[in-house]
């Protein structure tokens, strides 16, 4: 997935590809939670949420990119990246829940 969006900060600029993947993964997790509950498929939650979506999102890459920015002296960008990653991932999850609840209502 990261090949589609490019590379992160290791030798580059702001880690937008990793941020995008993490927010998208959170959105998909929100959709899955509601869809699985609606369809009676909650038994698949560990497989999909931990396995599939856990492998899709990139928390270890998020950590590396944050430390790389910090060690490069880009403390402001590191703080912005952490704030955007956490805030937008939570917003993405909430948007997925909202969308799926609208579909399955």
UniProtKB/Swiss-Prot annotation:
Highest taxon of the lineage: Bacteria
Topological type in the membrane: Multi-pass membrane protein
GO BP term, example: cellular detoxification of fluoride
Claim: Nucleus is one of the keywords in the record: no
Modulation of this protein's activity: Na(+) is not transported, but it plays an essential structural role and its presence is essential for fluoride channel function.
Positions contributing to Na(+) binding: 54, 57
Keyword annotations: Cell inner membrane, Cell membrane, Ion channel, Ion transport, Membrane, Metal-binding, Sodium, Transmembrane, Transmembrane helix, Transport
GO cellular component, one term: plasma membrane
GO MF entries: fluoride channel activity; metal ion binding
Transmembrane spans: 14-34, 44-64, 79-99
One Pfam short name: CRCB
Localization (cell): Cell inner membrane
Catalytic reaction(s) noted: fluoride(in) = fluoride(out)
Family, as annotated: Belongs to the fluoride channel Fluc/FEX (TC 1.A.43) family.
Function comment: Fluoride-specific ion channel. Important for reducing fluoride concentration in the cell, thus reducing its toxicity.
Record HAMAP family: FluC
The protein's name in its UniProt record: Fluoride-specific ion channel FluC
Organism in which the protein naturally occurs: Jannaschia sp. (strain CCS1)
